[in-house]
Amino acid sequence: MTAHGASREATAAARERLDALTDSTSVDVVQLADELAAVTALLDREVSLRRVLTDPAQAAEAKAELAGRLFGSQIGGPATDLVTGMVRSRWSQSRDLVDAVEELADIADLTAAQRAGVLDDVEDELFRFGRIVSSNPALRAALTDRTADKAARSELVHSLLGGRATATTERLVTRLVTTPRGRSLEAGLESLSKLAAERRDRLVAVVTTAVPLSDTQKQRLGAALATLYGRQMHLNIDVDPEVLGGMRVQVGDEVINGSIADRLEDARRRMAS
């Protein structure tokens, strides 16, 4: 097994344990998300601790016992079980463990949204927030200003999303803005959007059109893309008059072009060749 493969398999195993745990409605997933986020922050700060917890020379049970002693009195049983299970696994880099714990925190919050029936809203809100940030350099600068304290950045997010978005979206964005951990805001929002889509095992299609689509058009497009890719598709609709007509669809790294502008560009290329 490669080092990269080791962390990938450890993360996959942790996600399976989280899914099994959250299948029980008795688990408070919002509290679980908070506790996992707190563990993430601690491990991110304490480099020596995370190195000990991921040291392959140390016995798995000894690392699990250490994690249990450190975290057991500070977080609940479900979070402790997840973390101790994770430190039993093999990790290629100590930072991979931190990334995985953070991912579980995000998934727990998304599970709360799914239980509440607002996961679609969260997906749409994350997408729209990303578009707003990308079109407003001053806002982006304020949200990513490392000289501002966390409380100020948290308050800024609340002023933007409080009462306008779901509690889950505000929590996820606040955590990303206050604790970016080296990620750009755009990369963090994209990662959250992908996790949200995965909650329903769906792909995300970013659809750019010259004019807004009707509900019927959205349904037909979603059905056509689902047939094409063999998986349910979530549509993020972006209206851009410069498309001129038709639409542009991006699924992951694949782009499906069907706009007038693209056909004009193709014609220009053929004439120039």
UniProtKB/Swiss-Prot annotation:
GO cellular component: plasma membrane; proton-transporting ATP synthase complex
Membrane disposition: Peripheral membrane protein
Superkingdom, taxonomy of origin: Bacteria
GO MF annotation, one: proton-transporting ATP synthase activity, rotational mechanism
This protein's UniProt keywords: ATP synthesis, Cell membrane, CF(1), Hydrogen ion transport, Ion transport, Membrane, Transport
Signal peptide start-end: none
Keyword Ion transport in annotation: yes
Main location (coarse class): membrane
Entry's localization field: Cell membrane
Subunit description: F-type ATPases have 2 components, F(1) - the catalytic core - and F(0) - the membrane proton channel. F(1) has five subunits: alpha(3), beta(3), gamma(1), delta(1), epsilon(1). F(0) has three main subunits: a(1), b(2) and c(10-14). The alpha and beta chains form an alternating ring which encloses part of the gamma chain. F(1) is attached to F(0) by a central stalk formed by the gamma and epsilon chains, while a peripheral stalk is formed by the delta and b chains.
HAMAP family tied to this protein: ATP_synth_delta_bact
Family listed: Belongs to the ATPase delta chain family.
Role of this protein: F(1)F(0) ATP synthase produces ATP from ADP in the presence of a proton or sodium gradient. F-type ATPases consist of two structural domains, F(1) containing the extramembraneous catalytic core and F(0) containing the membrane proton channel, linked together by a central stalk and a peripheral stalk. During catalysis, ATP synthesis in the catalytic domain of F(1) is coupled via a rotary mechanism of the central stalk subunits to proton translocation. This protein is part of the stalk that links CF(0) to CF(1). It either transmits conformational changes from CF(0) to CF(1) or is implicated in proton conduction.
Protein name (database record): ATP synthase subunit delta
UniProt source species: Streptomyces avermitilis (strain ATCC 31267 / DSM 46492 / JCM 5070 / NBRC 14893 / NCIMB 12804 / NRRL 8165 / MA-4680)
Taxonomic lineage of the native organism: Bacteria, Bacillati, Actinomycetota, Actinomycetes, Kitasatosporales
